[in-house]
Amino acid sequence: MKKNVAVIGSSGAIGNAVSKILLDDETVQSVYNFSRSISTNTSDKENRIYIDIENEESIKDAVDKIPQDIKFDLIFVATGILHNENDVYPEKSIRDISADKFKKVLMINTVGPALI
């Protein structure tokens, strides 16, 4: 039986690489790619669904777009943040830690994936 796979965070480097490998795998029936960046499907077995793991409503909306009869054989979570272009970066001192930055990192790296 062919597998159904979900890749959460498929627009990042790791998620995108995993998705490409799965799309080329003949034992995989369908790949559901979840990300904030939605583009055109590259394969008949690919399904792209918008998700923002910092937003609980977005997670619920993404789940609602999965057909009821789909059961995933593998869920690969490739979300995460160490730094971004704005205000989140690796702390070099305890003074660099702020509540807002800490909340953002926890939401993306821990809470969001747990809600999925």
Regions found by a protein language model. Name each.
Residues 23-41:
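Conserved glycine-rich Rossmann-like NAD(P)H-binding loop of the short-chain dehydrogenase/reductase
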Residues 76-90:
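Conserved NAD(P)H cofactor-binding loop of Rossmann-fold oxidoreductase domains
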Residues 8-23:
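N-terminal Rossmann NAD(P)H-binding glycine-rich loop of SDR-like oxidoreductase domains
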